[in-house]
A protein has these predicted regions:
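Short active-site loop/helix that positions an aromatic residue
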Residues: 33-43
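Post-BTB helical module
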Residues: 77-165
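N-terminal BTB/POZ boundary and linker segment
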Residues: 1-34, 67-100
Length: 165
């Protein structure tokens, strides 16, 4: 049952609850609509989901069981300019696992059409890894390959060129 899953409140005036496989996220439809044309359509009048008015008192639950819970959580925290309190570094991509999770989030951003928003936030932290000395600093080749794939998925041509140049 979805209600037994934890709910993460990204904003106190969230009017939508995204119900994922293992968690629920209370988010702002306005923020997601601004960042994503897919969410804009989903929350608009042409979809059943968007035909009812939302309110923070009675947030609308939207099931997204096919999306990766961790990736959607990271993406929503990023779009809401919030930091997951349980995660010391939301863009910790120096480990192979962190880079793989970033790639999964990038694929989700691509799915929802908000790659540009991720690019703006991730450019500075990722620029460190475009330097060849990153390999000497302990970043694995596998982690770098995940990051290169993420830059490709995000259509971040500048970072992709830096990573592969």
């Amino acid at each position: 049952m979805a209600s037994s899953f934890p709910i993460y409140e990204l904003t106190s005036n969230g009017d939508v609850v995204l119900t994922l496989r293992f968690t629920r996220l209370r988010v702002s439809s306005a923020i997601l609509s601004t960042a994503s044309p897919v969410f804009r359509e989903m929350f608009g009048p042409n979809f059943l989901v968007g035909q009812n008015l939302y309110s923070p008192r009675n947030p609308k639950e939207i099931p997204l069981p096919e999306d990766d819970s961790n990736a959607m959580m990271r993406l929503c925290y990023l779009l809401h300019h919030q930091r997951d309190p349980s995660d010391s570094s939301p863009l910790n991509v120096s480990s192979t696992q962190g880079a793989k999770e970033f790639l999964t989030m990038a694929e989700l951003a691509d799915k929802y059409g908000c790659s540009h928003s991720v690019n703006m936030v991730s450019a500075e932290p990722l620029s460190y890894f475009a330097d060849p000395s990153a390999i000497n600093a302990g970043t694995s080749i596998e982690a770098l390959l995940h990051l290169i794939a993420a830059m490709y998925v995000l259509d971040d041509r500048r970072q992709f060129a830096r990573f592969t140049g």
